[in-house]
């Protein structure tokens, strides 16, 4: 420990002797002034950035594509002089980039037209040059009216610092084409959605219960899959049409035919469940057990319904039809002419009734 303290004291003594010398005094004076200036500049920059709003801070720190970013090699200084009775001979146009921030005040003013044999044409100005500086005043962020007032106040002598605006003109043309393409895409998309809605209505009828395709955005319409099958309304219409056709087919059968009343109705004693099948000739109700039904129906075909004196059907068939068709009205069926004539012949009326009742 004593050796370390001795070395420390010796180094401190040498440093004190150096600081007491004239060389250190001149060096400290020079570096001290520089350090104070740097600290003052850093403090001023920090105070300036701290007083800006948050949006302005990001804009001041991340600003790009500004007129001040161009190097001096890309700049051109032009002096235009005119007489009292003539003009400079150029037209300007202000342009704001479309991809800039909303809080950005960046705006370019460029020369859009040059008259031949004018002072501007003789001075070397070209169409597309960007006006970066006019008479020592930077035009960055100036509006069209401010630039015009600045040119008019310059008198007959105009000193313009220009930049090559070829890239800006190309970007302007591309952005104009982009806007046209966006408008065309919007129109075509509206037509596509209208056609898709018409197709949906043609397949499903009334599209009131379906989600409207016009209220969907691009993402929902891109996820719109294939159209579903027939809705419940179509199934109900098929069911009603089949019932009405079956009803008309049953009502067309009368007791006038000698073959009797033929039908494809079979009763299932265990379940009583029926299923519907549609064929090209007629519609009939068959039970779910197809094989048993075919065996039973083969023995029950061509069955005649006996007509009683009151002209109504037998209780068995009447009960079956009432249980199947529910509220369908029953049509009274008249007997054949031969049976009505046999009733007036004595001795034959009872025999005919007994013979038909055995069936």
From Swiss-Prot:
S-S pairs: none
Region: Interaction with CYTH1, residue numbers: 166-188
Keyword Cytoplasm: yes
Matching SUPFAM superfamilies: PDZ domain-like
Pfam family, one: PDZ
Keywords carried by this UniProt record: Coiled coil, Cytoplasm, Endosome
Coiled coil (UniProt feature): 166-188
Outcome (variant: residue 329 to S): Found in a renal cell carcinoma case; somatic mutation
UniProt subcellular location: Cytoplasm; Early endosome
SMART domains: PDZ
Induction comment from the UniProt entry of this chain: By TNF and bacterial lipopolysaccharides (LPS).
Name this polypeptide is given: Cytohesin-interacting protein
Gene name as annotated: CYTIP
